[in-house]
Amino acid sequence: MSWITPDLIEILLSILKAVVILLVVVTCGAFMSFGERRLLGLFQNRYGPNRVGWGGSLQLVADMIKMFFKEDWIPKFSDRVIFTLAPMIAFTSLLLAFAIVPVSPTWVVADLNIGILFFLMMAGLAVYAVLFAGWSSNNKYSLLGAMRASAQTLSYEVFLGLSLMGVVAQAGSFNMTDIVNNQADIWNVIPQFFGFVTFAIAGVAVCHRHPFDQPEAEQELADGYHIEYSGMKFGLFFVGEYIGIVTISALMVTLFFGGWHGPFLPPFIWFALKTAFFMMMFILIRASLPRPRYDQVMSFGWKVCLPLTLINLLVTAAVILWQAQ
């Protein structure tokens, strides 16, 4: 079989790795919806979903059946094409953002030299999905939620990008694998602590998670920009939000907590344990913090996060120049 060449085998293995990693991410995002409800029940001293399967373990299957068989309704007054396109963009952009995350020294979907810029580009693309969903629904609550989401996301993406520049300056590269290798001796969270704090805050805001979930506030906007969605279209938004949490958690691990580095255990296990810890922190934040007003969220971003990121960047640049002399 002369057509089986080493190059073809390498391509097939790369495709297999990509499929496995992306399937694991989607599965983790789906299971996180169940885990969140169980943990919220624990934090609030009540029962979570515990009726379907052992300990409620089949609740996810019940949710999937419900989602698959719900009517996929498109309002007559909506723009059908854009209304259908919005959840696809939201799901795909958040899933592709994980492609540049190195899970282990040998497992990464796309080892790009501009990995961080690719992540920021995908995060910016998700804003279009929210705007499309809000505008095409032709609903005042959807439009208000989309306007809130776009303003909030675009604002906090500024801090998200600036908080990473200190890490880039220290590693001397935008490549995620190079950044992880640069943390073999000391994790970036120590010299870049303020960068990590602002990245974590901006990451929660970009995911529209509590306490930055004003675009989806049920009490104010009746669930915001996806109020008109049902069935699998709503499912794409729903699972996409949890995929965003998985991606941000994985990026925290990769950029600030040494990625796969750790003693005794295999690299993939260390990466999974660290990522699971930050995913649990997202749930703990939701369970413990109140929701501020929208103007307070925006004011906090521009008056606290922006100065903090700029100070961190200036100090990092000064230290690098001092060490170079």
Curated annotation (Swiss-Prot):
| Family according to the record | Belongs to the complex I subunit 1 family.
Q: Where in the cell is it found?
A: Cell inner membrane
Q: Name one Pfam family in it.
A: NADHdh
Enzyme Commission number(s) from the entry: 7.1.1.-
User: What is the stated purpose of this protein?
Assistant: NDH-1 shuttles electrons from NADH, via FMN and iron-sulfur (Fe-S) centers, to quinones in the respiratory chain. The immediate electron acceptor for the enzyme in this species is believed to be ubiquinone. Couples the redox reaction to proton translocation (for every two electrons transferred, four hydrogen ions are translocated across the cytoplasmic membrane), and thus conserves the redox energy in a proton gradient. This subunit may bind ubiquinone.
* Molecular function GO terms recorded: NADH dehydrogenase activity; oxidoreductase activity, acting on NAD(P)H, quinone or similar compound as acceptor; quinone binding
Q: Does the keyword Transmembrane apply?
A: yes
Q: Quote the catalytic activity from the record.
A: a quinone + NADH + 5 H(+)(in) = a quinol + NAD(+) + 4 H(+)(out)
User: What's the domain of life for this entry?
Assistant: Bacteria
Going by the UniProt record, its keywords in alphabetical order are: Cell inner membrane, Cell membrane, Membrane, NAD, Quinone, Translocase, Transmembrane, Transmembrane helix, Ubiquinone
Species name for this entry? Citrobacter koseri (strain ATCC BAA-895 / CDC 4225-83 / SGSC4696)
Query: Mind telling me which GO cellular component terms the entry cites?
Result: plasma membrane
- Transmembrane feature ranges: 11-31, 50-69, 81-101, 114-134, 154-174, 186-206, 237-257, 265-285, 304-324
Task: Give one GO biological process term.
Answer: aerobic respiration
Principal localization?
A: membrane
Instruction: Kindly provide the name given to this protein in its UniProt entry.
Output: NADH-quinone oxidoreductase subunit H
InterPro entries hit by this protein: NADH_UbQ_OxRdtase_su1/FPO, NADH_UbQ_OxRdtase_su1_CS
Asked whether the keyword Isomerase is assigned, the reply is: no
What quaternary structure, including any partners, is listed in this protein's UniProt entry?
NDH-1 is composed of 13 different subunits. Subunits NuoA, H, J, K, L, M, N constitute the membrane sector of the complex.
Q: How does it sit in the membrane?
A: Multi-pass membrane protein
